[in-house]
Amino acid sequence: DEHPHFSWHPGMLVPDCHMQTVFLKDLVSAVAPTNPYSFVNYLVKHKKFYRFLTSRLRTVSREEFSDYLRWAAEDMNNLYFSHTVENIDFDKKRRLFLVQTSQGEYFARNICLGTGKQPYLPPCVKHMTQSCFHASEMNLRRPDLSGKRITVVGGGQSGADLFLNALRGEWGEAAEINWVSRRNNFNALDEAAFADEYFTPEYISGFSGLEEDIRHQLLDEQKMTSDGITADSLLTIYRELYHRFEVLRKPRNIRLLPSRSVTTLESSGPGWKLLMEHHLDQGRESLESDVVIFATGYRSALPQILPSLMPLITMHDKNTFKVRDDFTLEWSGPKENNIFVVNASMQTHGIAEPQLSLMAWRSARILNRVMGRDLFDLSMPPALIQWRSGT
């Protein structure tokens, strides 16, 4: 890893920001619950098991989950930080991958790519500045918002977390706060019991065999199971607004602006002018803001360290890998050498693939393939829902 030490989304570790998945969906518990790197063992080792239970938390804060991951990482002796991977090639004589880093070279029979996604900004954003940036950098920048007009763009969980903290004055008391979303409302995360079935190995098994157009349709239908806002967050925001305006009778300096896309962003004096288009009535509006924060999600991006291997890799299209069920890429090298990839195959593995929900199962699937045997028992119980026909 190129970073000097372990850090998990440090820019989004803002106060009162919680995970969307239950704490048992940790590094190991789903496949090896007695493994010492379980979240429960983390609680025991830190002498807070009973207080955690008394707190009755179904989900934990992002700060605590980050601390759990850091604790696990610091106990492992095979993690190398401050190592920037510069190129990966395949040595035909050794029949091994050659990983070239800023600190030296490594040979491996198999490699796993986990470089993740890149922050997405709308096309109208030409570059980031101190007053216009992506939400993933909020806690790294910690700007002073005192007396400023603030606009948060994005109607998902990250947008909600930033809006709530700005509302509470976490970075100073703002003069005005706007929350803009393309969606027609600030929609809740779908946490229904049967929706959670999308985040199971059984569902992935059925999903991956469907035709491509059907998979795309299903991903669109299931979007709110991963991209919505938790009911707790929405209720907290609503109560904050009620208390501020109906009880304290403060000036209404908050604007909630759904059904709008930011089409143009222009510098305007020390701040910014946003031009927006309303999806439902086709109206056009402008908005002046001193600070604009884009909570607009992430985009898939091919790793920049693969120019030597790319001619050997079979692509689904120019920006998407062709990924098998066991998370290996199709490539023209020896069959005993595998290129695994994670967080890069939602189109084939379903809505759960980029999420933490199946992290332990996915890792076990990869390790079983590497070892050539079932190191972990991943056999599935009878399905609760018959996702596919019997034909």
Regions found by a protein language model. Give the residues of each.
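Flavin (primarily FAD) cofactor-binding/catalytic cores of flavoenzymes
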Residues: 1-4, 8-11, 52-157, 161-391
